[in-house]
């Protein structure tokens, strides 16, 4: 720790009592303590401590004593100093580490191990300052009581009197205002004998003038609004139309769309297509048969009328060949190739065949 100005200021007023049984060590320590700015009182005898401490000429602020003395035990010195007065004691020695806790419990403020250095003495003033502060705090705990008196000057009394008069005036005005307010809230009804109408009379006419005026919509502003929006009346009428219908009790339910029967439409479509197909078949049946010798080779078989008519019908229906149709089977287990064979053999009439085809199609398309 550096020797600051604050350390020098406090150390100049502190007197240290140095106690050591070795005279050489005592002289060296005294020199180092004086260099730090302390006043030193040195002795080698522990029996001289009471005389030195009680001496009024030199006030002792701190005791720096060796831990092991010849005349006394290591703890007897602390107990003796504590019995005389409350002075901070700093203990020094070569083997002080073993008894630091015991020394602190018996009243020691600090334990220093030898050899001592100059920096060890620069912090001694802190123990004396803390002791002085504790002593002053004990003195100021119960300060003497002082008799305090309050004197009112003439200006203060006049001001208080003026404030009292103003408060009385304010209370009178407040009472008057409450009375007027109570009268204004009272309304009386009177009946006109001629017309039989009831009118209200307000006793507090002044309070009625203070009411908030009503907001009126000017005619000029309304006309300008109607000119700016010419269709506003029509929009209002359209908006009121549903409410008027609802008030009159008329039903405003929307009509549900008509349902279309798919089966009837399918039968109608099948009948029309059947008529067209029968007409085309009859026209082809009236054509002359193809000649065998002219258009057919020696190893070719001429087409018979049923075969040519069946092929034309299949082409009009845009149906695939029997090889691809054999893979597709109808719901009743009958393939289109079987129907073609029946046509070639002449089983059944064309009308029955087409009726069967369209009924099967109707079953598949029926939802």
From Swiss-Prot:
InterPro entries referenced in this protein's UniProt entry, alphabetically: ARR-like, CheY-like_superfamily, Sig_transdc_resp-reg_receiver
Disulfide bonds: none
Coiled coil (residue ranges): 158-192
Positions of the UniProt region annotated as Disordered: 158-213, 227-259, 282-312
GO-annotated biological processes: cytokinin-activated signaling pathway; phosphorelay signal transduction system; regulation of DNA-templated transcription
Domain of life per record: Eukaryota
Residue stretches of biased makeup (Basic and acidic residues): 189-212, 236-257
Record's GO cellular component terms: nucleus
Keyword annotations of the record: Coiled coil, Nucleus, Transcription, Transcription regulation, Two-component regulatory system
Domain Response regulatory: 15-129
Subcellular location, record wording: Nucleus
TM segment ranges: none
Similarity remark: Belongs to the ARR-like family.
PANTHER family linked to this entry: TWO-COMPONENT RESPONSE REGULATOR, TWO-COMPONENT RESPONSE REGULATOR-LIKE APRR8-RELATED
Protein name: Putative two-component response regulator-like APRR8
Species this chain originates from: Arabidopsis thaliana (Mouse-ear cress)
